[in-house]
């Protein structure tokens, strides 16, 4: 079962070895949208690869999200099975823009994360109702 294509609110990671990049994607997605999902154990083309899932794996993801994204968000992290392969699904939402990851302010453009311009960041800080175009 293919999970589809990556988008502005959906990202696939082959494993939790890409956790740093996933954290950046979460902040980036939230700076443009109010919600998103990251899947660990899925190829970029949406095909399931599988991921070893333990309590410490889930804790590592949760701890990084709580520690490295400001302001803090509380994600939903679940293990799902697709074609007999374990996948980690991280669902998140937040409306307290702007969000930073590792002290960097990023925004999602298509399937890529890019640094916000000074003007974009200024608008987000000054106008809490600002919605990225």
Regions found by a protein language model. Name each.
Residues 1-133:
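Conserved N-terminal catalytic/coupling substructures associated with nucleotide/phosphate chemistry
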